[in-house]
Each structure stands twice: as structure tokens, then as C-alpha cells.
Amino acid sequence: MKNHVATFCICIYYEILVPLQRLSIRQMTPYELAYEYVMHTNRSIFLTGKAGTGKTTLLRKLRVECPKQMMVVAPTGVAAINAEGVTIHSLFQLPPQLFLPTPIERKKLFAEMQMRRPKQRLLRNLELLVIDEISMVRADLLDTIDAVLRRMRHRPNLPFGGVQMLFIGDLYQLSPVAREDDWNYLRPFY
């Protein structure tokens, strides 16, 4: 894990800090580097670490200081409250179901989706989407978020419709919740 952090830090150093003439990489924590990365690029990032390593502190700092149009979502109500955000299903007006990544299922989802204009406008103007507790998000739900953003933003060729994604979570904590039947449906796709 330590080598991955070092590699990540070096990549950020040459991509962001050198051009910006910021602090030396030795003077910054990985979370300070992640903050600079989110603030000064449009690239997506996965931020992980065990409890107490600064993930929530980074999120709070971004809420206050980030000039980007930003939304924070989480897979459950409790996680959304803790992150001061909303649930994924609420933001994207998704029913509580499996989302198989087939053309027929996608067409059906979009036909049934009824999103009010303010929410459509919010998604079209969105620049940064933070998903907290990402370890609890099933692959089909993440694919659906991608499909909805591509469609709503009229950018079908860009991942997540061109929205910068910040995935926060610890993959060693909670895993996605699904019944055995659900996993049987999802297994051929994921």
C-alpha cells in the first residue's frame, strides 16, 4: 500500500504541484495532495484510507473552499446524513432495484425516469460529484449513475458525462448490500 501512495503522490506532484509552484511533496500529506488534485484538475480520483486518516476532513474542506458546482451523495440515508449530502437514489430519482446494463433495461429506466427541471439543471451544471462510502455502492448502481450523467449532460462519450468524480471510502469496511438472488442476476455482467 505504501508504494501505491508514493506512486500516487509522485504523479500528483508532477501533474499539479510543479506547474503550480506549490509546496514540496515532502511537506504535504496524501490528503493535501488529493485536495490539490481535486481543486486544480477535472480528473476523477478514488480516495481511501482507514478510519481517522482525514477523508471526512478533506470532504468538509472541499465543501467550504471548492468553487466547483459540487454534490455529495452516499448509498444510504445514514451515510448521506454523515456526509451532509443526499442519497444516490434521491439525487438521481432512481427506484430501489437492480440496474442491469443492457440496452433494453436502460431504455426502460430512462422512459420511467421523471426528473423535475431544477434537478435536471443541477445535474447539467454539476462539476464535481462526491460519492462517500463508495465501498457500499454496487457496480450496477455506479454504471447507472454514469449512464444518467452521460444522458442528462448530453455527453455520451465522456465517463460520467464529463463530471469529475471523487470516490471516498474504505474497501475494507462495508461491502454492497444485495440478496443472493440479486448477485445471481448481476454475476453475468460484473
Please identify what each model-predicted range represents.
Residues 2-3:
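Polybasic, lysine-rich low-complexity intrinsically disordered segments
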Residues 9, 13, 20-190:
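Conserved ATP-binding/catalytic motifs of P-loop helicase motor domains
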